[in-house]
């Protein structure tokens, strides 16, 4: 499987399966001599952990990254950084009755065809959201390196169904605002919508269903001039890694699809001078023009599909016997993956941005 990417000097390779012994990541190209706050890494990863309030899976994994190379006494050595996370709370028996039933919304069937029937189906195998744990470790390390270069990143839940948070101010969002939501139970700018979101998730769960949502990301402190045109633009790199997060189905930068309903005079961001720096008065371009940063905040949003594992009966097929079947999924699943996916989206984008700086 190609669960790896290489952009410039940075390469990241993720390994393991949801119900295997362990999962992990190898990161090459990180700058030697960089001090990493390991407690801060653990705090970052804890944001991805299941909540104990009915909004996420009951699977309980400690997700402690055992660093086996590339770091000594909290300092990066410059050689490949490898971290391994043990899987300790698998319930593989939940999947025996559905081994060859194509779960709607999952990659069981496509993986079976792609890998000639050899893919690990337990818990989704390598296609599982479980595999984002090592991605978030890598993203946590990247976040610290970015911050040491004056770049602050963050994300929040923009919406779950019809419950919507405020958007980041695309022109004036700042580092302090990005940091404020990081440790909130649900990462929201406007905490008053939290209960509405909880009610939507609880209702879906009670109805044996699930819901999706939208996550918004921002990065501030990037200078103008980072990126490349056409096929290696900063949007391209961000999108490629973001789509490695299971459940992501769409991405838009700046004003996104709204630009299709604008005149050029509305969409164009006029330039100005502020405190001796070139800026734009608006930021419909999301901080990127021609694949290159403009110096304005990078802003993008991603659409997360509802968790496909639901307990409602669904029609499917057994792809080994070629018969139609009825499927009722058992096990422990998130009625809404969006809250736990916020640090995953941050991690993906952080790594993409970091790839231009090393």
Describe the predicted segments one by one.
Residues 1-358:
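Generic N-terminal targeting/processing segments that precede catalytic cores or assembly contacts
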